[in-house]
């Protein structure tokens, strides 16, 4: 167990007794960013290049790298402009809007709901519970989930309240060092918990944390995404506050290395992607995403790029940086080459030869053209494209997965052209992907015989419900960030207006059912925290686009692959 701790008073009744600021914030004058939204264009302010813009080649060769790293945490680029709210402790007040920005009445209600979800450990806020729904059995919805807390954390950072995020990062890091066993098998040292809860012993008047590393999850699957989200959030905290001291702590440096050591170890893999089991990410039940799911690959890519900015380049850190650089080059080429689908690529796959041998093969995964689903030919617009769900030997999952594609844009796994194509697809297929509630977690739903085979007759993942084509409001923040990065804020504004028509009235459901997301999910929890936080983050990003810098990385020009095709191509 880690030796560092946060010493505070014990909280006996769930209400905060004493919250001391963990850092001093300097007052910064208000800046009006409303004009940034007047024209749908990419944020592109010429400033000194930040570390995010530097190529991977430069990263490994520069002796001044650590100084550049620290400099990148200062406000020197459009992907990080200090938020007007940063430096103002809002306490428990709803943040005021920037001049010219009309706040929707439900913003205040959303902040109240987010405050009610806060969890305290020994007097300090350490996260937000998954849902505040007393009408249903709690199950594990009263826990703090790593992936669920990310939009909450971003909301607090954007509102100038970094303490809860810092506490969360430290507490989950401490949990990482715990011994992790499922039955008689010990998990890897770097595995981060899926969730944790605070247990209060009234006899001893003492609080402890109880973590779940997958031993209590559906299917008993370890959360592959938790570690990646932790690294991404650490970088967001560093960018937002300009404080690198947390990331520079030996414990945090070790935590990053342990997480990535699980992913960068050598084995039998012939691909740079990560092999995963079903249920290892947001889609936490059997849904046919085993293999190399786009969500994990995109998060892996973004976590690697964030780690490159956070790791110290000396000793163990330098060796890992070299591994990261090599993996990023291979991963970006693989994903952009084999996961990308547009009209031309779809037509090419339709005409694939099969049973090709040797290094000249074009159909490297031996995908049978007859296995292409009929729906994808109608779904693909003339101008548009997306990263498909999965690619493995003799198998391509052509489903659209929102989270993976949005993260691909934010991390610059997608090239600028691919990012534009993804946004074109969303606009062209608005009714299918947004409908009456943004955003479809995947499209289309699987049904009938395929549903029985793929899900094992899962009653929660029936067609157009939950993860099987359900609509998830939390994805609104990812869509908004992607829209702003690609210079298409009008798409986000339209999606937010759609959500505002129902979210508050329906009491912030976890997800919606139906082909267009018309119905509150049959097992959906009300007052779902990340639905609340996702809306708030989306609104604040539109209000101040500079906030996107917390979760946005610029393209590295060195990673753009040269596409070549061999003579075995069918003409």
UniProtKB/Swiss-Prot annotation:
GO terms for biological process: carbohydrate metabolic process. InterPro entries: 6-hairpin_glycosidase_sf, 6hp_glycosidase-like_sf, Glyco_hydro_100. Keywords: Carbohydrate metabolism, Glycosidase, Hydrolase, Phosphoprotein. The modification Phosphoserine is found at residues 21, 55, 83, 85, 568. Pfam families: Glyco_hydro_100. One of its GO terms (molecular function) is endo-alpha-N-acetylgalactosaminidase activity. Its EC number is 3.2.1.26. It comes from the Eukaryota. The modification Phosphothreonine is found at residue 94. It catalyses: Hydrolysis of terminal non-reducing beta-D-fructofuranoside residues in beta-D-fructofuranosides. Invertase that cleaves sucrose into glucose and fructose. Belongs to the glycosyl hydrolase 100 family. This is Probable alkaline/neutral invertase B. It comes from Arabidopsis thaliana (Mouse-ear cress).
